[in-house]
Curated annotation (Swiss-Prot):
Name listed for the protein in its UniProt record: Probable aquaporin TIP-type
Database matches in Gene3D superfamilies: Glycerol uptake facilitator protein
Function comment: Aquaporins facilitate the transport of water and small neutral solutes across cell membranes.
Native organism taxonomy: Eukaryota, Viridiplantae, Streptophyta, Embryophyta, Tracheophyta
UniProt superkingdom: Eukaryota
GO CC terms of this entry: plant-type vacuole membrane
Keyword presence, Acetylation: no
Main location, first listed in the record: membrane
Species this protein is from: Medicago sativa
Length: 249
C-alpha cells in the first residue's frame, strides 16, 4: 500500500510563524531532555569521583532519561508534536511531516542539545560525557543495536501518538515513549550508551569535541526510525481496521 502523504513542503511553510514556534518548542523540549539526561550522568560521576560504570549508574541513567523524555514529549506535544529527536525522519518517511518542517525541527533539536551541553559544562565545571562505543564493541554490532533500539522507540511513537486508531489514550503516549527509552538504555547503555537520538549525542560531541564513531549515532537512529515509519504506515495505518473500544485514562 502506498505511503499516505510524503511531501517536501514549501519555503513558506519553513518560515511560517507556526513552524518557527514549533521549532522553538522542539528546542526547549530537547534542552529539557538533555539537561536531565546528561546532567544526571555528570552528577553520578561527581558522586563516584569518576569511578567505573556500575549497574546502579546504568539504572539511574535509565530512570532519568525515561522521566525527562516523558516531560519533554508532554510539554511539546500540543505545539510541535513533541518529537525531541531527529529520528523524526521516520515520521517524514511515513508521510506525517514534510521534509522542510522536519529539517526545522532537527536544527532546533541540535541547537537545543548544544546550548544545553555548553550550559552543563558551565554550571557543573565538569565535562559532558560524550557517547562512544564501549571497549570490545564493534562498529557493526553497535550500528545494529542503535537501529533496533530506535526502531522500538519510533514504533512506540507511531502506535501511541500517530496512529489515528489509537483512540483517546491521554498521557499514555509520552509515558510509553519514556518507558521504551528507559528500557532500551538498560539494554544498550553498556555497549553504545543507548543514544537512539542524534541530537542527544550531537551536543556533547560538539562541546567535548569528541567524534569517535559519531556517525553510528546518526546512521543507527535514522535508519531505525525510517524503517519503523515504513513498517507502521504500510502494515497498520493504511490497513482497514475496526476501531476497538477505548478507555479514557
Amino acid at each position: 500500500m502506498p505511503i499516505r502523504n510524503i511531501a517536501v513542503g514549501t519555503p513558506q511553510e519553513a518560515t511560517h510563524p507556526d513552524t518557527l514556534k514549533a521549532g522553538l518548542a522542539e528546542f526547549i523540549s530537547t534542552f529539557i531532555f538533555v539537561f536531565a539526561g546528561s546532567g544526571s550522568g555528570i552528577a553520578y560521576n561527581k558522586l563516584t569521583n569518576d569511578g567505573a560504570a556500575t549497574p546502579a549508574g546504568l539504572i539511574s541513567a535509565s530512570i532519568a532519561h525515561a522521566f525527562a523524555l516523558f516531560v519533554a514529549v508532554s510539554v511539546g506535544a500540543n505545539i510541535s508534536g513533541g518529537h525531541v529527536n531527529p529520528a523524526v525522519f521516520g515520521a517524514f518517511v511515513g508521510g506525517n511531516i514534510t521534509l522542510l518542517r522536519g529539517i526545522v525541527y532537527i536544527i532546533a533539536q541540535l541547537l537545543g542539545s548544544i546550548v544545553c551541553s555548553a550550559l552543563l559544562v558551565f554550571v557543573t565545571a565538569s565535562s559532558v560525557p560524550a557517547f562512544g562505543l564501549s571497549e570490545g564493541v564493534g562498529v557493526g554490532p553497535a550500528l545494529v543495536l542503535e537501529i533496533v533500539m530506535t526502531f522500538g522507540l519510533v514504533y512506540t511513537v507511531y502506535a501511541t501518538a500517530v496512529d489515528p486508531k489509537k483512540g483517546n489514550i491521554g498521557i499514555i503516549a509520552p509515558i510509553a515513549i519514556g518507558f521504551i527509552v528507559g528500557a532500551n538504555i538498560l539494554v544498550g547503555g553498556a555497549f553504545t550508551g543507548a543514544s537512539m537520538n542524534p541530537a542527544v549525542s550531537f551536543g556533547p560531541a560538539v562541546v567535548s569535541w569528541s567524534w569517535s564513531n559519531h556517525w553510528v549515532y546518526w546512521a543507527g537512529p535514522l535508519i531505525g526510525g525510517g524503517i519503523a515509519g515504513l513498517v507502521y504506515e504500510v502494515l497498520f495505518i493504511n490497513s482497514t481496521h475496526e476501531q476497538l473500544p477505548t478507555t479514557d485514562y
